[in-house]
Amino acid sequence: MKNNISKFPLSFSKSAIKKIKTIISEKNIPNLKFRVYIAGGGCSGFQYKFKFDKNKNKNDTIVNIFNNIIIIDPISLQYLRGGQIDYIENLEGSKFIILNPKAKHTCGCGSSFSI
C-alpha cells in the first residue's frame, strides 16, 4: 500500500486548524480525517468540497501537519497545491474557504472556480 505523505502542499490558517481540530475532537471517532477535494459542478465548473472521513484511499495524500489529519486525493491535489484553506465566521455564517492561486475565475460565493 502506497503511503503518500506530503509536507505542506496546502497551507492552513490558524482558524482552519483550530476548527478542524475542534470538530474532530467533538465527533470523538478514532482515525477521523478532514478530506479536501474537488468535484465537478457549481457556476464556474469545479467546486471545493470538505468532509470528515474515517477512510483513507490507497492513493490519497496525507498532509503532514498537526497529526496527519488532512487527506487529499491525487486529482484534487493537482488543483489545490499551493492554495490556502481558511475558516471564516461572519454575519452570513461560517465556512471553510480555499484561496487558490491556480483558479482563474471564482464565483461570488467562493465555492466554485475554473482553471
From Swiss-Prot:
UniProt cross-references to SUPFAM superfamilies, sorted A to Z: HesB-like domain (SSF89360)
Domain of life, source organism: Bacteria
Ligand binding (iron-sulfur cluster): 43, 107, 109
Pfam families to which the protein is assigned, alphabetical: Fe-S_biosyn
PROSITE patterns for this protein: HESB
Entry GO CC: cytosol
GO molecular function terms noted in the UniProt entry: 2 iron, 2 sulfur cluster binding; 4 iron, 4 sulfur cluster binding; iron ion binding
Cofactor field: iron-sulfur cluster
Cofactor binding notes: Binds 1 iron-sulfur cluster per subunit.
Record keywords, A-Z: Iron, Iron-sulfur, Metal-binding
Biological process (GO), any one: iron-sulfur cluster assembly
InterPro entries referenced in this protein's UniProt entry, alphabetically: FeS_biogenesis, FeS_cluster_insertion, FeS_cluster_insertion_CS, FeS_cluster_insertion_RrpA, HesB-like_dom_sf
Similarity comment: Belongs to the HesB/IscA family.
Quaternary structure and partners: Homodimer.
Role of this protein: Required for insertion of 4Fe-4S clusters for at least IspG.
Name recorded for this polypeptide: Iron-sulfur cluster insertion protein ErpA
Gene name per UniProt: erpA
